[in-house]
């Protein structure tokens, strides 16, 4: 840690405590993530270290840059570029109103970051407003990319705060283990709806069952016809057969018709039918300049 001075604590992350830090040579402000490792562990698993070191190669303006990996006696500190606030805090400052141009800009930046990582075969797996960071220039950056693969997604944050299910797709809630890029696209859809509603989450489930019910009340309950193989997923449970809603304009009233169309292409229960990040970036919601109206 000699290279960095530890300053004040910024918060608790999924994997450990986050501090503000300063590079002693360049005076650059950074974020220091101290990763908590299990006490009975043999220190840092080599597989995790390999994964983490690969992430240093991911350089894109919409990805929070991993600057350094400091590894010593069972301690692992990840040094990231520092951003001013996360999307959750940004929402809290809004008082329930968001400029639709800002909503669109943030969503496009989110998709650009996703497309870049997906093209390098890196998934996020735990996207949520808390790990979308925003700097003073209105640039949005994805944080904690690839960490889920290196460390696993814990059921509880080490600070005992429960890891949110609100952005998890139905396939993962049903126990699917083979993750593809589609997991992040579902989360992106949940975030688009939340952006358009100035920070009100679309599916705020209290547990796995409640989460699935909230989703199916909107999208309709899937079955073997609409989603072949769904009933064979390891944690599948038969749920009441809800019809899909007919009016998305009531669900996300602030979002214009093109935005709603994109949302419907992201929020599809069957994972292989969700739109990709690359395709979503080309959607008329972003390309049509008259898109601000309804």
From Swiss-Prot:
<feature type="modified residue" description="Phosphothreonine">
    <location>
        <position position="14"/>
    </location>
</feature>
<dbReference type="GO" id="GO:0007409">
    <property type="term" value="P:axonogenesis"/>
</dbReference>
<keyword id="KW-0808">Transferase</keyword>
<feature type="modified residue" description="Phosphotyrosine">
    <location>
        <position position="15"/>
    </location>
</feature>
<dbReference type="GO" id="GO:0005524">
    <property type="term" value="F:ATP binding"/>
</dbReference>
<keyword id="KW-0131">Cell cycle</keyword>
<dbReference type="GO" id="GO:0051642">
    <property type="term" value="P:centrosome localization"/>
</dbReference>
<dbReference type="InterPro" id="IPR000719">
    <property type="entry name" value="Prot_kinase_dom"/>
</dbReference>
<keyword id="KW-0547">Nucleotide-binding</keyword>
<dbReference type="GO" id="GO:0106310">
    <property type="term" value="F:protein serine kinase activity"/>
</dbReference>
<protein>
    <recommendedName>
        <fullName>Cyclin-dependent kinase 5 homolog</fullName>
        <ecNumber>2.7.11.22</ecNumber>
    </recommendedName>
</protein>
<dbReference type="GO" id="GO:1901987">
    <property type="term" value="P:regulation of cell cycle phase transition"/>
</dbReference>
<dbReference type="GO" id="GO:0048489">
    <property type="term" value="P:synaptic vesicle transport"/>
</dbReference>
<keyword id="KW-0132">Cell division</keyword>
<dbReference type="InterPro" id="IPR008271">
    <property type="entry name" value="Ser/Thr_kinase_AS"/>
</dbReference>
<dbReference type="GO" id="GO:0035011">
    <property type="term" value="P:melanotic encapsulation of foreign target"/>
</dbReference>
<dbReference type="GO" id="GO:0004693">
    <property type="term" value="F:cyclin-dependent protein serine/threonine kinase activity"/>
</dbReference>
<dbReference type="InterPro" id="IPR011009">
    <property type="entry name" value="Kinase-like_dom_sf"/>
</dbReference>
<dbReference type="GO" id="GO:0008582">
    <property type="term" value="P:regulation of synaptic assembly at neuromuscular junction"/>
</dbReference>
<dbReference type="GO" id="GO:0008340">
    <property type="term" value="P:determination of adult lifespan"/>
</dbReference>
<dbReference type="GO" id="GO:0070059">
    <property type="term" value="P:intrinsic apoptotic signaling pathway in response to endoplasmic reticulum stress"/>
</dbReference>
<dbReference type="GO" id="GO:0005737">
    <property type="term" value="C:cytoplasm"/>
</dbReference>
<feature type="modified residue" description="Phosphoserine">
    <location>
        <position position="159"/>
    </location>
</feature>
<dbReference type="GO" id="GO:0005634">
    <property type="term" value="C:nucleus"/>
</dbReference>
<comment type="function">
    <text>Probably involved in the control of the cell cycle. Interacts with D1 and D3-type G1 cyclins. Possible regulator of neuronal differentiation and/or development.</text>
</comment>
<dbReference type="GO" id="GO:0051402">
    <property type="term" value="P:neuron apoptotic process"/>
</dbReference>
<dbReference type="Pfam" id="PF00069">
    <property type="entry name" value="Pkinase"/>
</dbReference>
<dbReference type="GO" id="GO:0008045">
    <property type="term" value="P:motor neuron axon guidance"/>
</dbReference>
<dbReference type="GO" id="GO:0016533">
    <property type="term" value="C:protein kinase 5 complex"/>
</dbReference>
<feature type="binding site">
    <location>
        <position position="33"/>
    </location>
    <ligand>
        <name>ATP</name>
    </ligand>
</feature>
<comment type="similarity">
    <text>Belongs to the protein kinase superfamily. CMGC Ser/Thr protein kinase family. CDC2/CDKX subfamily.</text>
</comment>
<dbReference type="GO" id="GO:0004674">
    <property type="term" value="F:protein serine/threonine kinase activity"/>
</dbReference>
<dbReference type="GO" id="GO:0007629">
    <property type="term" value="P:flight behavior"/>
</dbReference>
<keyword id="KW-0067">ATP-binding</keyword>
<dbReference type="InterPro" id="IPR050108">
    <property type="entry name" value="CDK"/>
</dbReference>
<feature type="active site" description="Proton acceptor">
    <location>
        <position position="126"/>
    </location>
</feature>
<dbReference type="InterPro" id="IPR017441">
    <property type="entry name" value="Protein_kinase_ATP_BS"/>
</dbReference>
<feature type="binding site">
    <location>
        <begin position="10"/>
        <end position="18"/>
    </location>
    <ligand>
        <name>ATP</name>
    </ligand>
</feature>
<keyword id="KW-0418">Kinase</keyword>
<dbReference type="GO" id="GO:0008344">
    <property type="term" value="P:adult locomotory behavior"/>
</dbReference>
<keyword id="KW-0597">Phosphoprotein</keyword>
<keyword id="KW-0723">Serine/threonine-protein kinase</keyword>
């Amino acid at each position: 840690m000699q290279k960095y001075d530890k300053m004040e604590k910024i918060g608790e992350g999924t994997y450990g405590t986050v501090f503000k830090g300063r590079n002693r040579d360049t005076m650059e402000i950074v974020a220091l993530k101290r990763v908590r490792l299990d006490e009975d562990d043999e220190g840092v698993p080599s597989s995790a270290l390999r994964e983490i070191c690969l992430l240093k190669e991911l350089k894109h303006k919409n990805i929070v840059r991993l600057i350094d990996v400091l590894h010593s006696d069972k301690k692992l500190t990840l040094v990231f570029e520092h951003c001013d606030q996360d999307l959750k805090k940004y929402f809290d400052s809004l008082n329930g109103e968001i400029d639709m141009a800002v909503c669109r800009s943030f969503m496009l930046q989110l998709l650009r970051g996703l497309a870049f990582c997906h093209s390098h075969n890196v998934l996020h797996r735990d996207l949520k407003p808390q790990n979308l960071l925003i700097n003073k220039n209105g640039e949005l950056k994805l944080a904690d990319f690839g960490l889920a693969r290196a460390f696993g997604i814990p059921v509880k944050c080490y600070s005992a705060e429960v890891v949110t299910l609100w952005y998890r797709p139905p396939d993962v809630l049903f126990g699917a283990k083979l993750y593809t890029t589609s997991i992040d696209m579902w989360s992106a859809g949940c975030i688009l709806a939340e952006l358009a509603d100035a920070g009100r989450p679309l599916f705020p489930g209290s547990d796995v069952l409640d989460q699935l019910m909230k989703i199916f009340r909107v999208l309709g309950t899937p079955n073997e016809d609409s989603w072949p193989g769904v009933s064979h997923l390891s944690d599948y449970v038969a749920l009441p057969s809800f019809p899909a809603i007919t009016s998305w304009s009531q669900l996300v009233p602030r979002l214009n018709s093109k935005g709603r169309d994109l949302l419907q292409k992201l929020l599809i229960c069957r994972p292989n039918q969700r739109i990709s990040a690359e395709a979503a970036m080309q959607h008329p919601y972003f390309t049509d300049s008259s898109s601000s109206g309804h």
